């Protein structure tokens, strides 16, 4: 039996003991997108699909793999700034798209600037963003918003962190370690996700 066949058999066996969370079907042998991840349907059940495990920012990606905003370009603002004949005050600091600049001799075209590639679909010329910067998911931020209760003095896991419940009996008030947890690898109860789990999270 080939390696792929063995891998699929192991995956199928593992899922047989697990309740189906997402019963949607997919065409066997087809490839599909799930947010920023690429998936392969091998048994017709979408929840069993083999998927990459990138952490997809849902402020950027739709579930079907399309982007909510245009893909960042490779345009360099410095090239356009060289054509800029606007005046500036020597010594003044200013933003030009995503770059930081310092005026040298009174002309913006001669300013000294960082050379990052700026996406004009994201940044305005004055350095402000056209839409809010996506917030990185953080297990600690989520825990502190939790309305769940816990037994005072009890130890528990919250994603990859170890916690001790305080006298208040609230998960949000517990004392926890502060590791950065990948929610595509960890479940809220501290157990690890199977590597084949569909990246749509069901906690």
Swiss-Prot record:
Q: Where is the composition biased (Basic and acidic residues)?
A: 129-148
Where would one find the signal peptide in this protein?
1-19
Identify the tissues in which this protein is expressed.
Answer: Expressed by the venom gland.
Q: Region (Disordered): which ranges?
A: 129-150
Q: Which cysteines are joined by disulfide bonds?
A: 26-41, 36-56, 39-51, 88-103, 98-118, 101-113, 150-165, 160-181, 163-176
- Intracellular or extracellular location(s): Secreted
What are the record's GO terms for cellular component? extracellular region
State the superkingdom.
Answer: Eukaryota
Describe the location of the Pacifastin domain by residue ranges: 23-59, 85-121, 147-184
Keyword terms = Disulfide bond, Protease inhibitor, Repeat, Secreted, Serine protease inhibitor, Signal
Q: Name one GO molecular function term.
A: serine-type endopeptidase inhibitor activity
| UniProt-listed SUPFAM superfamilies | PMP inhibitors
Which InterPro entries does the entry mention?
Pacifastin_dom (IPR008037), Pacifastin_dom_sf (IPR036201), Prtase-inh_pacifastin (IPR016307)
Chief place where the protein resides: secreted
Q: State its role.
A: Inhibits trypsin activity and prophenoloxidase (PPO) activation, an enzyme essential for both clotting and insect innate immune responses. It does not inhibit activity of chymotrypsin and protease K, and has no effect on phenoloxidase (PO) activity.
**Name of the protein:** Pacifastin-like protease inhibitor cvp4
Naturally occurring in which organism (per UniProt): Pimpla hypochondriaca
């Amino acid at each position: 039996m080939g390696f792929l066949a063995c891998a699929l058999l192991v995956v199928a066996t593992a899922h047989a003991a697990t309740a189906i969370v997402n019963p949607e079907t997919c065409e066997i042998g087809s490839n599909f997108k799930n947010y920023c991840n690429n998936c392969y349907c091998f048994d017709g059940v979408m929840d069993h699909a083999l998927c990459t495990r990138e952490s997809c920012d849902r402020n950027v990606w739709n579930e079907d793999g399309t982007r909510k905003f245009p893909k960042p370009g490779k345009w360099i603002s410095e090239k356009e700034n060289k054509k800029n004949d606007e005046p500036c005050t020597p010594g003044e600091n200013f933003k030009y798209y995503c770059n930081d600049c310092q005026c040298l001799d009174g002309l913006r075209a001669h300013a000294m600037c960082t050379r990052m590639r700026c996406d004009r679909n994201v940044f305005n010329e004055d350095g402000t963003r056209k839409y809010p910067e996506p917030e990185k998911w953080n297990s600690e931020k989520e825990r502190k918003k939790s309305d769940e209760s816990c037994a005072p003095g009890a130890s528990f896991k919250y994603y990859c962190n170890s916690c001790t419940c305080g006298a208040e009996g609230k998960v949000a008030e517990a004392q926890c370690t502060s590791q950065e947890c990948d929610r595509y690898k960890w479940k809220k109860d501290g157990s690890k996700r199977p590597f084949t789990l569909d990246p749509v999270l069901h906690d």
